[in-house]
Amino acid sequence: MIQVRDVVKSFDGNVVLNHISADFEDGKVNMIIGQSGSGKTVLMKSMIGLHQIDEGQILFDTRNGQQNLAGMKEKEVRMLHREVGMLFQGSALFDSMTVQENVMYPLEMFSDMTNEEMVARARFCLERVNMPERSFNLMPSEISGGMQKRVAIARAIALNPKYLFCDEPNSGLDPKTSLVIDQLIQDITREYNICTIVNSHDMNSIMEIGDNIVFLRNGIKEWQGSRFEIFHADNEALNDFVFASELFKKVKSANG
């Protein structure tokens, strides 16, 4: 679990996160949503230590007890990152490495495994995301964008993380492939009881897998709830966000 408590972040005097408090739960897909400029990317980057917050606390339940990210030294942040998997907006695979070598990379950097153990773990993770064995020795350029995203997920879970951060994981994918990636993220979250945090503005994805949703507007948390509550939320800003989405337009069109 991650507890964000009264977090403030400013850039050049401009408040981007204004006293944000929210809980992000284990075994659930926690989504940070909002329009561009709402602060969702800054919040996610603050939660993984890429931005130093001005005020507040970001509390992680780690294998060594609860730790406050705010004020951690660089070495301590690196130690925390061993429990964190990251899925970037682009797949961010290394072009010079094979599919299997890409998944082995974090193991080489952060684990004490033998080469044989790393190979076995990488292959297990690739199989878990339904990558065919014939693809393991291919280069990223030789597989599709959807497969590249699967490899990125396999790499993100290689170290058996407690936390998985996903930045717009469906960016650039067609609807069918996006659904597959959503289901993979949801299944892995449930199976390994991971605290998954997804930064998204895609209503299809939000309504497919959003267990715990935090809606930001202009750096303020306007609403928090589940995907089953989102269409009934008594919040004008959230309603505007939902009604402007392509998903709502399709539903409205289908219903005449």
Language model regions located:
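Conserved ABC ATPase signature
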Residues: 139-143, 147
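Helix-to-loop junction immediately C-terminal to a conserved catalytic motif
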Residues: 48
